[in-house]
Regions:
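Residues that define the transmembrane beta-barrel architecture of outer-membrane proteins
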Residues: 26, 54, 58-64, 108-113, ...
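Transmembrane beta-barrel strands of outer-membrane/channel proteins
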Residues: 32-40, 82-88, 131-137, 172-176, ...
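Surface-exposed loop and membrane-interface regions of Gram-negative outer-membrane beta-barrel proteins
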Residues: 39-125, 137-150, 183-185, 193-203, ...
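Outer-membrane beta-barrel architecture
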Residues: 67-69, 116-118, 159-161, 211-217, ...
Length: 488
């Protein structure tokens, strides 16, 4: 009881003294995002390829974010704020799911996504500038209908936003993401390493990635703005572990660089965004439906390069009819594919009968999604979403001393019809939304085409719960269900 009384006294003292400093009574605000529902999709599907095929009628999880924030103080023209956010994710339709990690197939996941502090109006000469520090979502760029954040370097960091420079605004940030490198990738998944396996010098790893980001936004003409952005990614390894496991300079993971040019154009009946992204170095894998933050820890992408093109938008053709769309093209190359080289880093094929070593030498992808919608009544509408994607990995393989080139390809198509209820059916952004949908899918089995490689025409898919079945080249499925989504 004594400890409780001391804590209460401290809280009371703080609450009494704070207004004296700032002459301001804090106000709290509550915000978030949520989606949940039910569908006939196979319950073991963890994370469908929404970036490739679109979110409508292709969601199989429960996901929510809850945020709390407040303006703690106001001094002259400055505002001092604190913001926080936690997220929840569940993949199975169980009534009771704990956060216990002992059973990875049934537990729910919680994550602390944001906790940061900011002050706006600190500079007398630039009242729009914001100084911030903490962990936060940082300038995420996304395509809504694909539920894909193609530029997302969120994490722990600090920075200054919206500095006035010429006709535009400049934002600078340093963000850090830590990585646990006690694992490696096999052909299909992440594998935790035992101590003796860590001596495998082909997986050197790193301890953290530091992102140095600069973004400049400025108007170019009527209803149009340009964004120029550059991110330099510095990979930092744990020196103790690096030396402990005998890694040397050739095992180092190189740094990466990303450049973006983006044009946002508004119209009286909608908007359109076109973006071009150039990737260089160890983060080039982000050119394949990535976020810009992933690093190839094998070191095979140290000399790689890639380009990604995006176009997406929303157009109202009539008062009741509109179309959203997204187009994506990517290509990358320059990977270390010298399977005969001393420093070569490759993968062992999962199929024991056709065991060999493979390496990526190139990659290309294309995606197109169209999302027309028609308002029926004030609070209902019909939505149709069609999408297509294809990906090809150019590879070099070595087996029994023989080197050969081959391609691995995966592709898919989706068509969804949905009846949607929302507060304002004329507004595509109106939430909450309840969607009754039916979806047809045609894709590679489990996202993998087993007809390529070293003649492995069939393979066995092993789910997280141990369930096994044979995989085939093509996969057709019809999914129906009801999902809700909201943000506030």
């Amino acid at each position: 009881m004594k400890k409780v009384n001391l804590l209460l006294a401290a809280v009371v003292a703080a609450s009494v003294s704070a207004p004296a400093l700032a002459e301001y009574t804090p106000n709290a605000h509550f915000y978030g995002f949520a989606r949940a529902g039910v569908s006939s999709q196979h319950y073991n599907v963890d994370d469908p390829e929404k970036a490739r095929l679109g979110r409508l009628g292709y969601e199989s999880d429960i996901y929510g974010e809850v945020g709390l924030g407040t303006t703690v103080a106001k001094v002259d023209d400055s505002e001092w704020n604190i913001n926080s956010r936690v997220a929840y994710k569940s993949t199975l339709n169980k009534d009771w799911q704990t956060a216990d990690n002992t059973n990875s197939t049934e537990h729910a996941n919680f994550a602390f996504r944001e906790l940061y502090f900011d002050v706006k109006g600190f500079f007398d000469s630039d009242k729009d500038a914001v100084i911030w520090a903490g962990k936060r979502y940082y300038h995420r760029e996304d395509i809504y209908i694909n539920d894909w954040r193609y530029y997302d370097i969120s994490g722990m960091g600090t920075g200054i936003e919206n500095l006035s420079l010429g006709s535009g605004k400049l934002s600078l940030a340093w963000i850090r993401r830590d990585e646990n490198r006690d694992y490696k990738w096999d052909e299909t998944s992440k594998v935790v390493l035992e101590d003796d396996e860590k001596l495998d010098k082909t997986y050197s790893g790193y301890g953290a990635v530091h992102f140095l980001d600069a973004q400049y936004d400025f108007p170019v003409w009527d209803k149009a703005s340009m964004e120029l952005r550059a991110t330099y990614m510095i990979n930092q390894h744990d020196n103790a572990k690096f030396l402990q496991y005998g890694y040397v300079a050739k095992n180092e993971v190189g740094n990466g660089t990303r450049f973006e040019v983006k044009l946002n154009q508004g119209f009286s009946s909608g908007w359109n965004t076109t973006a071009v992204i150039f990737d260089f170095g160890s983060h080039t894998g982000s050119a394949g439906f990535g976020t810009g933050s992933w690093c190839d820890s094998s070191g095979a992408a140290n000399s790689a390069h890639g380009i990604s093109l995006f176009n997406y938008g929303d157009f109202k053709i009539t008062d009741r009819f509109g179309i959203m769309h997204s187009i994506y093209f990517a290509r990358s190359g320059g990977y270390d594919d010298n399977v005969n080289g001393e420093n070569f880093i490759g993968k062992v094929l999962a199929d024991e009968e056709n065991k060999g070593v493979t390496a990526n030498s190139g990659y290309k992808a294309f995606m197109f999604a169209i999302h027309p919608y028609y308002q029926l009544t004030k609070m209902t509408k019909l939505v149709l979403e069609g999408s297509f994607y294809t990906e090809t990995w150019s590879k070099v393989g070595k087996k029994d001393g023989v080197v050969k080139n081959f391609d691995e390809n995966q592709k898919g198509q989706k068509l969804t019809l949905a009846y949607v209820l929302s507060p304002d059916a004329s507004n595509i952004w109106s939430k909450p939304e309840i969607r009754l949908f039916a979806t047809y899918l045609h894709s590679n089995e489990n996202g993998i085409d087993f007809s390529n490689g070293f003649g492995a025409k069939e393979a066995t898919i092993v789910y997280k719960n141990g369930y096994e079945r044979e995989a085939t080249k093509n996969h057709n499925n019809v999914i129906f269900g009801v999902y809700g989504e909201a943000w506030w």
